[in-house]
Amino acid sequence: MQHVPTIAIVGRPNVGKSAIFNRMAGRRIAIVHDEPGVTRDRLSAPCKITDRACKIMDTGGIGARLSDGFAEQVEAEADIAIKTADLILFVLDCRDHLTPIDQSIADHLRKSDIPVILLLNKADHEKQDLNLGEFAGLGFDDHIFLSAAHGRGFSELASRLDGFLKQKGAPLKEELEEEPENGEETALPIKVAVVGRPNAGKSSLVNAILRDRRTIVSNVAGTTRDAIDVPYLHDGQPYVLIDTAGMRPRSRRDTSVEVFSAMRSEKAIRRADICLLVIDIAAGITQQDRRIAGIIAEEGKPCIIIVNKFDLFHPNASRKDRMAEVEEQVRRELFFISYAPFIATSAKKAEGVEIIFKVITRIRRESHNLPTTGQLNRLIQLAQQMNPPGAASGSARRLKIYYATTAVDPKYNTIPVPRYVLFVNDKSLLTDSYSQYLRNKIREAYPAPGIPVIFSARSRVRND
C-alpha cells in the first residue's frame, strides 16, 4: 500500500487554523473531528487542494489562554505533530506581533527534523506580503503569505505541497481511487431513518413518499437484516430511506414487539444522517415514543418529528387550535429533542408529505450556520457575564469557561453536527441547567433547526 503523507497544521488559537483546514479539506463546515473525546484536539481529513494524496491534521487548541500552566500543553501538542507528520504548516497571524506561545511553538519545532512551512495568514492585501518582519527571526526559511478568508495564496500552497509530496513518493489521487466516468462529483446520498413505534404509520409514510413522481427507486437489502434501504432521488439529491417498517418480528407478546421495535430503531438511528420520528398523535405520545426520541438525542442526530394521523386528531376543531395543542404536547413530552421541528401529516392521505424534503433541505443548508472560533468565544463570554454560573452544591467553587472551539465528526458527512468543546476549570461543575442555557444562547445567535447542540467539556488546570 502506498504511503499517504500527513501534513500537520499547528499554531495558537485565533490565527485561522480552522479556516485554513476547511479550505484545504474542501469543506465549508467546521473542522472535521476524527474521534471526539479520544484524540483530544487532533482533527484530520483528506487534502483536496493538492494533486497528490495526503492527509491534513489540525492540532487545535495549542496554548489556549496563555498561562504558565500551559507550557506542557504546548509541548505535548507540538510533539503530536512532530511524531505523526511528514510536514508541518506553522500558522501565524501576520497582522499581530509574535506572542510567547508563537515563540514556544517555534522553539519546539526547530528541535525536530520535520520540515516546516510558515503560513502567514490574514494577509488580505498584497502590500502585507512585503514585510516578513519579526517572523524572519523564527528560523524557518520557507514561508507563504495567504488569506484563508479570501482564498489568497492557496494556489502557491498547493504547488509547494505537491512538490514536497512528489519527493516523498506520495501517489497521485487518481492512482488511489477511480474517478467517475463523466468526470463529475457524485452527490453523497442523505441517509434518512424512518423510525417510531409499531403502527405509528411508518409504512404509510414511506409508501406516500415513494408514490412521488420524482422518485427513482429500487429495493435492496440493507446492511442489517431488520431494515430495508430504499434509494430515492428527490429534486436531483439522492437519499437512502432506511425503512424499519414492515419488518416487525413475530411475537405473541406486545412487550416483545416493543423491545424489538426499539432495537431496530436504534440500529437505523445510528446509521442515519437524519431521523424522521413518526408519532401517532391520535393515540397520543407514549413511553415508547419517548424512548426512541431519547436514543436520537443520545446519538446526537438531526431530527424531524412527523406528527402522523393528524387528520384523526380532534377532527372537529380548527387547524390552528389542533396545531397549538400538538405543539404543546410535543414540546412537553419530547422536551429533550426540543431542537427538532415537527410536521403534521396524514400519511395515508399523503397530506403534508411534500413538506418533509423541503424541511430536510433547509436543515442541511442551515446546519452550516456555525460560529467561528472567535464568535463562539465572544458569545460564551457574554453569556457568562449575563448569567454567571452558580456555585456548586455545598461548595464555593464556580464553573469557569476558559475557551471554546467547534468540531464536526466525519461520520456526519452530509449534514454536519457540531460538537462544542469547552475548556473549563472543572467539567463536573458544568450543570445540565447551565448547559441548556448555553445551548439556548447558541441557538438564538446561530439558529439551525433540527440540529442538536452538543457540548464536550474538558478540565484544564490553570496556575493563575
Swiss-Prot record:
SUPFAM superfamilies: P-loop containing nucleoside triphosphate hydrolases (SSF52540)
Residue sites binding GTP 1 per the record: 11-18, 58-62, 121-124
Gene behind this protein: der
Key words of the record: GTP-binding, Nucleotide-binding, Repeat, Ribosome biogenesis
Task performed by this protein: GTPase that plays an essential role in the late steps of ribosome biogenesis.
Alphabetical GO biological process terms: ribosome biogenesis
Domain EngA-type G: start-end pairs: 5-169, 190-368
InterPro entries: G_ENGA, GTP-bd, GTPase_Der, KH_dom-like, KH_dom-like_a/b, P-loop_NTPase, Small_GTP-bd
PANTHER family: GTPASE DER (PTHR43834:SF6)
GO molecular function ontology, one term from the record: ribosome binding
Subunit comment: Associates with the 50S ribosomal subunit.
Organism: Akkermansia muciniphila (strain ATCC BAA-835 / DSM 22959 / JCM 33894 / BCRC 81048 / CCUG 64013 / CIP 107961 / Muc)
Record protein name field: GTPase Der
Keyword GTP-binding: yes
UniProt binding sites for GTP 2: 196-203, 243-247, 308-311
Family statement drawn from the similarity comment of this UniProt entry: Belongs to the TRAFAC class TrmE-Era-EngA-EngB-Septin-like GTPase superfamily. EngA (Der) GTPase family.
Ranges where the KH-like domain occurs: 369-461
Pfam families referenced in this protein's UniProt entry, alphabetically: KH_dom-like, MMR_HSR1
